[in-house]
Design a protein with these regions (language model features):
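Long, positively charged, glycine-interspersed low-complexity recognition regions
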Residues: 166-223
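Mobile active-site "lid"/loop adjacent to the S-adenosyl-L-methionine
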Residues: 104-112, 159-171
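Class I S-adenosyl-L-methionine-dependent methyltransferase module
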Residues: 45-137, 141
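Short, polar loop motifs at secondary-structure junctions
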Residues: 32-37, 120-123, 191-196
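Short, conserved active-site loop motifs that form the nucleotide-linked donor/cofactor pocket
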Residues: 133, 149, 209
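Conserved proline-anchored active-site loop of SAM-dependent methyltransferases
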Residues: 14, 28-42, 49-54, 95-98, ...
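Glycine-rich phosphate-binding loop signature in dinucleotide/nucleotide-binding domains
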Residues: 21-24, 144-148
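S-adenosyl-L-methionine
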Residues: 1-33, 37-38
Length: 223
């Protein structure tokens, strides 16, 4: 399923790093799970996925419970989808939109490309590996994080297009990270830009699509 902000192209770099850090952990927590490209590839005794996007979490829960998305979505279906139930609204809003931007315009492909079918197949395949994932629709600070967890945070980037209408307070988030780190939690943050006054160790990979990815591996001395 096409999804703005999805990490499908860099998952092969991120997952091994996360998996290595999970060796002595009981739980993997994805606080901003989005389309679940990362958590679906993670192996852990317990997995928690959270996102503030209500319809998106409704979609994941519906598929996990056996709902099968439609194989065909017409332009008229797309126009009516904002009044649909949350799970169908999310499927059409993300999976059938241009570049995966939530209701960013009906996607039209060349030839016989079927965006709905592609999104359906991708989502169902992904959920084959997520039968035991616990899904939540909460603010990141409200999630009950078990001790001995690895917490992965793919936060909204500054000055980029968001898939949610809510603004994101980066300063508050980093303060929360500092508090969680003090409690002994292992927190990794994926971000495009790192503040100059932040003392961190980063994992950096230059991708073929000419973008630097920074994986924060230590949240010490933040702010």
């Amino acid at each position: 399923m096409r999804y703005m902000g999805g990490k499908v192209r860099i998952a092969k770099y991120l997952v091994p790093v996360l998996q290595e850090r999970l060796k002595d952990k009981d739980t993997f927590v994805d606080l901003f799970c989005g389309s679940c490209n990362i958590i679906s590839a993670i192996k852990a005794p317990n997995r928690i996925a959270n996102d503030l996007h209500k319809e998106l979490i409704a979609l994941h829960k519906a598929v996990q419970s056996g709902w099968v998305p439609p194989s065909v979505v017409t332009e008229e279906d797309y126009k009516q989808a904002k009044q649909a139930e949350d799970h169908l609204k999310a499927f059409i809003g993300f999976g059938c939109s241009f570049s995966g931007k939530y209701f960013g315009g009906y996607a039209r492909g060349e030839g016989d490309r079927n965006y709905a079918l592609n999104a359906k197949n991708t989502l169902l395949k992904k959920h084959q590996n997520m039968k035991d994932v616990e899904f939540f629709n909460l603010n990141y600070s409200e999630v009950n994080i078990p001790s001995n967890s690895l917490v992965y945070c793919d936060i909204p980037y500054k000055d980029t297009t968001k898939y949610s209408t809510d603004s994101f307070d980066h300063s508050s988030f980093y303060s929360w990270c500092k508090d969680m780190k003090a409690r002994g939690l292992d927190i990794l943050v994926l971000c495009s830009l790192v503040r100059k006054d932040t003392n961190i160790v980063i994992f950096m990979k230059l991708l073929a699509w000419r973008c630097f990815v920074f994986l924060v591996q230590s949240m010490q001395n933040l702010m």
